[in-house]
Amino acid sequence: EFHDVNKYFGKFQALKNINLTIDRGEVVTIIGPSGSGKSTVLRCINGLERITSGQLIVNDFDLADKKTDMNRIRKNVGMVFQHFNLYANKNVLQNITLGPELVLKRDKAEVEQEARDLLKMVGLESKADSFPGELSGGQQQRVAIARSLAMKPKAILFDEPTSALDPEMIGDVLDVMQKIAEQGMTMVVVTHEMGFARHVGNRIVFMDDGKILVDSTDVNQFFDDPQEPRAKEFISKIINH
C-alpha cells in the first residue's frame, strides 16, 4: 500500500504522490515510458530504495519506519531482475537451494527436492548440475524465477524480466510467469511485453513522469480504447510498430 509516496534522488523527483494498493493474488502490470518511475516503485516495495515521504505498508510492515527489518520484508517479497544475478560459481541446483538453506534454515534434502520440482516447473530439470555460464539468457532467467519461488514468498516483483533476452527466448520466460500467475501468486510486473500485460495481468497501471496516470482492472478497455491522453499516445506508438 502506497499512500502519498514521494521519492527523490537528490533534486530529481522520481515518484510523485503515488497511491497504490495491491491485494493478495493480483497480477499487476506496470507499463509506461522509460524513466517514468516504474522500477523505482518495485525497488521501494522490497526496500532497495527508501521512500522520501508518505507511507508504504508491505505485509503489515511500515517501510517508512527506519526500525523496520528489511530482511523480513525480503523473505516475503521475491524479486526477479532484468539481469539474472545468479552465482556463476554455483550450479543451478545450488543457486536455488542457497536461500532456503541459509536464510530460512531449512532441511537440505527437503529444499533440494523442492528445487528439483521447481526446475521441472520451469522446464529445466535436466540442467540441475549445469552452471549459469552454460545456459542461455532465457534459461538463466527461468532459474532466477525458480530461485525466487524457492523462498516461498507472498509476492514476487518482476523488473523488466525479458528486456535483456533474445526475442526467441522471451516466450519461455513469459510462459513460466503465466503459470505462476495461474497458481495465485501475487505479482507486480514492470514490462514492455504488452501481450503479457493484456492477457495475464488482471490490473494495469500506466506511469509517466513519476505519476500514476491510469490504474484499471479493465485491461482490455485500456488497450482497445485508452481514455487518458498520455496513455493513448503511448499505446498507439507501441501497437502500431
Regions picked out by a protein language model, each given a short descriptive name:
Residues N220-H241:
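C-terminal boundary and immediately downstream tail of ABC-type ATPase nucleotide-binding domains
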